[in-house]
């Protein structure tokens, strides 16, 4: 039997990332053969990862990396927020964003096949991380955005890395692009422009807005407040030329009824049309970047502000950890609590 020295254990730990006891056991089982011990730990790690495969990993971090004219934003999940702050986990997230920005995979399968600087694939890195960290660690998704030489990336992470954003802005500078990304992080747009919204989605959202107005009007009636008008339109996509022409005609009729002289109508109509557009694009304001009120200048929309500084938003990607993941009631933290309770009762 070979002597298992502290030096051997340390070397194996450095190669595998395993804990002290796991490394020592592997060396004992392989009679001190370093290569066999590494392989044994790898196999045990795969087994541990398989056992954790059905767990829900909804915590974690985003990673953002810019590589020349290519930028990547990724989401990596863990089971608990505690592990998401682990140095090994953070390093894995950052390495994932870097290798994806450099490798430009087309999908998750291609991403997981990318080779890390350590020589292992990304998939193997996640198996090993699950084994050494002790929780299910999973690579969830990524987005790649490319830009032209004259354009600017805005890379931004918020809330300790739970939100990651990449934006591309034409004109301006990197600082402006970062400000746009800060807006995106805060206001949660899902698309750039109203042209990307599905017609049925707009109708459904408009119905929800009018339902909210209906409920509000019931409350207002109880205190003798006037009812709010229902919305006829929710998006610029619904405002055809005929709708715009009719709105202008209604404004002119209103001004005439009020006795306003026609010579001043040209000064009044633009402001009223702006109000009409604002009132009838509520869905756009909720979901499209360009229609949102800019957080850095609330007198303008994002589109209007960028236009005022000769810039234009081209594209963006925003990830927030855990969005769309349904957590099971019996998650990892609950399992730990249940295990501790059982131990105390025995």
Curated annotation (Swiss-Prot):
Q: Where's it found, cell-wise?
A: Cytoplasm
* A cellular component annotation (GO) from this entry: cytoplasm
The segment annotated Involved in Mg(2+) ion dislocation from EF-Tu runs over: 80-83
What PROSITE patterns does the database record attribute to this sequence? EF_TS_1, EF_TS_2
GO molecular function annotations of the record: translation elongation factor activity
Q: Which Pfam families match?
A: EF_TS
Q: Which UniProt keywords apply?
A: Cytoplasm, Elongation factor, Protein biosynthesis
Q: Which PANTHER family does its entry note? A: ELONGATION FACTOR TS (PTHR11741), ELONGATION FACTOR TS, MITOCHONDRIAL (PTHR11741:SF0)
Protein role: Associates with the EF-Tu.GDP complex and induces the exchange of GDP to GTP. It remains bound to the aminoacyl-tRNA.EF-Tu.GTP complex up to the GTP hydrolysis stage on the ribosome.
This protein is called Elongation factor Ts
Q: Which organism is it from?
A: Streptococcus pyogenes serotype M1
- Gene symbol here is tsf
């Amino acid at each position: 039997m070979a002597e298992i020295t502290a030096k051997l254990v340390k070397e194996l730990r450095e190669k595998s990332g395993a804990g002290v006891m796991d490394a020592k056991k592997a060396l004992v089982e392989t009679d001190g053969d370093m290569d066999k011990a590494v392989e044994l730990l790898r196999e045990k790690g795969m087994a541990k990862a398989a056992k954790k495969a059905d767990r829900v990993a909804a915590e974690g971090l985003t990673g953002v990396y810019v590589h020349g004219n290519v930028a990547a934003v990724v989401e990596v999940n863990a089971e608990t927020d505690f592990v998401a702050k682990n140095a090994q986990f953070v390093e894995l997230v950052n390495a994932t964003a870097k290798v994806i920005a450099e490798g430009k995979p087309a999908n998750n399968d291609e991403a997981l096949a990318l080779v890390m600087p350590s020589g292992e694939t990304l998939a193997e890195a996640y198996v090993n991380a699950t084994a050494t960290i002790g929780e299910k660690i999973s690579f969830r998704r990524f987005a790649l955005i490319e830009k032209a030489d004259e354009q600017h990336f805005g890379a931004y992470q918020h809330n300790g890395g739970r939100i990651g954003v990449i934006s591309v802005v034409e004109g301006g500078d990197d600082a402006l692009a970062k400000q746009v990304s800060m807006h995106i992080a805060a206001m949660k747009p899902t698309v750039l422009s109203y042209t990307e919204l599905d017609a049925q989605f707009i109708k459904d959202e408009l119905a929800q807005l009018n339902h909210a107005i209906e409920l509000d009007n019931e409350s207002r009636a109880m205190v003798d407040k006037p009812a709010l008008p229902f919305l006829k339109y929710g998006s610029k996509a619904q405002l055809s030329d005929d709708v715009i022409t009719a709105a202008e005609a209604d404004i002119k009729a209103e001004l005439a009824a009020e006795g306003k002289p026609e010579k001043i109508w040209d000064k009044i109509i633009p402001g009223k049309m702006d109000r009409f557009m604002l009132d009838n694009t509520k869905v756009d304001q909720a979901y499209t970047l360009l229609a949102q009120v800019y957080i850095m200048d609330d007198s303008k929309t994002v589109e209007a502000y960028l236009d005022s500084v000769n810039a234009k938003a081209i594209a963006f990607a925003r990830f927030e950890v855990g969005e769309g993941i349904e957590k099971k009631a019996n998650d990892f933290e609950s399992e730990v609590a249940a295990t501790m309770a059982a131990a105390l009762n025995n």
